[in-house]
Amino acid sequence: MITRRDFLKVTAAGGALASLGSVTEAKAAMKSAVPDEGFCHEGARKIPVIAEVDLVVAGGSSRAIAAAVAAAKTGSRVYLVGYMPYLGEDICGSHLYERKEGEKLQTALARKLFPGKNFPTPLHIKKTLEDELIDNNVQFLYSSYVTNVLTDPSGKPAGVVIANRSGRQAIRCKTIIDATHNASVAGLLGAERKPFIAGSQEFCYTVVGNTPKEAPEIIQAEELSQPIKVGEKSYPVTRYTFHLPLKDDSYASLAEVEQIIRNRTWDIDQVDSSDLLWYIPKQTINSEKAYNGNPVSWRKLPMQAFKSKNIANLWVLGPCAEIPRELAAKVMRPVPALFIGEMMGETVARQIKDIPVPAQATVRQLKVNASNYGQTGELLSPLRPSLQKGFVASPAGALPVLGSYDVVVMGGGTAGASAGISAAKQGANTLVLEYLHGLGGLSTLGMIGVYWDGFRGGYTAHIDKSVLAMAPKDHPRQPKGEGRFPADWKMEWHRKELLQAGGKLWFGVMGCGALIEGSQVKGVVVATPFGRGVILSKILIDSTGSADIAIAAGAAFDYTGKKTIAVQGAGTGKWAPGDYYNNNDWLFVDDTDILDVSRAFVQAKTKLQGQYDLVKIPQTRERRRVIGDYIISVYDVINHRRYPDTISYHKSSFDTHGMIIDPLFILNPPEKRHKIYDADVPLRCLLPKGLEGILTTGLGASAHRDAMPVIRMQPCLQNQGYAVGYLSALCVKENKSPRKIDIKKVQRHLVKIGNLPERVLTDKEFKGFSNSEMKKAIASVTDNYK
């Protein structure tokens, strides 16, 4: 976007040069002065430093852990940053549990991971890798993306900046091992690499339980030698090899390929599949010395092929190393890569032993004449007072604009999936962004696949009927009883509904900030496995479940802490193929605190030892709640308060899992354990106070913590998501903000489909009680204040 001031500067400079007869120079000057709309300006800021170490390892693959542990054993201080909610993203994420013929277990870690002839379970892999880090004093975080790098005054690596649900933090170091699949950290440092060439790319994808499929893009469908056995059940495992075009080196292109592959392979018998595509990128870095041979042993593989040519102290432990692509396909499989990782960890540790951590470091920023779309807001608070190591400067720079959409939904969970589908069905150009590799959130990947309470009419009734209709009534996986849904069926139904409606879907993306101009939210800042960027929106739906983006934009919020330590119980349950309900309540966790989340996953693996696997998302019932234009109270629920702008209808008991704090409950605790209350939620509770162009849904809505249990049931939030998606699309069509939209028009549609009772069309605003009415009420109180 070019401003009036920019326009005047450009035309003045170009005119001056043209008047001197230099038309070529005039064109060049104008081109360099015109802001690039493909980039968004970002202002200067300071990033909190949480650690200072010798080595940072970026990536959570088995080879990354091997390198980190090997370096730690030499005495190096190591910090590992993994972007998935588990370690072993190559084995567990891409489903590479088998050993190929000739793959020898040459390291102690390899022998621990693959102890016998049978395929190891995901939980065994994850816990073994985690224990290796803990036992060797390697610090690590889950669910964190490397988004920027630190450099010293000479341009050498001096650390990384990471993004997670706690915000962004910096880690200072001497050197970096980039163990990401696409050498994304090397890219952030400006490491030279071969040019990208568009064309056909080979991708591998593994499914469990399905019958083999045929499609023009499938060049091989191999049934692996061992099925997956859980109890008395046995499931075949099929690995597909696809040839598909990769249009460019953007994350959007990879996301598109992923959805095509999922389209071609899914059926109703599927009980599991890869989170991540396995492939060997055609691009490599330019290394100190390319290797073109075929070593007789992995030990003969020269480390120079893994070291950047133009960036000192940068190593690439991944398939983008400068080795032949056929060789990369062999050595990046888990067993050989464990050996390579161990070699690299030892080599790097020796080379940096006597090098000091750079005394000065700043965030490396893109040098682009970026457009001024607005300001980027984010959380920049230290994780803990005890971890505060100062700050590093992040000068003004630029973020790539990854796309522009009518409606962007950040979070594809219980409400977010419905919101995206609804907006797309109304014709809005819609993008849904989800951190995990499936839709539905806690209702699917969180293994809470059975309804408790909730209003099951309206759009939810459509979901329920449609999901169960995906298979014949006599299918062995059809659940017995109402309100139960196989997790993978529901995930797939959401996914296909969104895509068939014309929506776009990117998995593996985390929201880490907001783009704002004044009070207007204009987009979301995201972290992807390829780096950080901005996605522009006309309407942004914050379905993170904890108002992450609204808070980053400056919205006030409420949560446990200063006022009270009360928090509802949570869990981190087991999972095995075919499961859809493993609810539990055994821990307390703040799922917006990355240290607490990482701790919960560590603790869960010990508790669940011997199980097949565990969930990929903490099963939390209480999160940050935005302060909206209105805050629903316990009194509103008990008194059945009505509103003229009701957007969703809810039915539940006070299903609290922990201490209640509202003073009303001291006088008069909730009645019977399972008394059902009906509650309306007005649109005002989904509108962050002081912000335009954004709505929050679900557990992030504006409500008192003791009122939230009545309005957080899955059936109700599916309906709420649909309503918000419909409203957002209408805002785009009519070019109005959510506060200016004709709410009665929205309500009429929601009444028609059964989301809302017809009375909402005539409900009036409650004006409250006068002082005289309150005095009369107090005087008439009897029967223990009831």
What role is predicted for each listed range?
Residues M1-I2:
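Secretory targeting signals
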Residues I50-S61, L402-G413:
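Beta1/beta-strand and adjacent pyrophosphate-binding region of the FAD-binding site
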Residues A44, A70, S76-R77, V81-G155, ...:
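Conserved N-terminal/central alpha/beta ligand/cofactor-binding core
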Residues S22-D54, G60, R364:
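C-terminal segment of N-terminal export signals and the immediately downstream linker at the start
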Residues K46-I47, D90, G102-E103, F119, ...:
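Flavin (FAD/FMN)-binding glycine-rich loop and adjacent Rossmann-like elements that form
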Residues V53, T74-R77, N136-V138, A312, ...:
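Loop/turn elements at helix/coil->beta-strand transitions in domains of secreted/extracellular proteins
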Residues A64, G416:
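N-terminal Rossmann-fold NAD(P) dinucleotide-binding loop
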Residues D6-A28:
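N-terminal export signals
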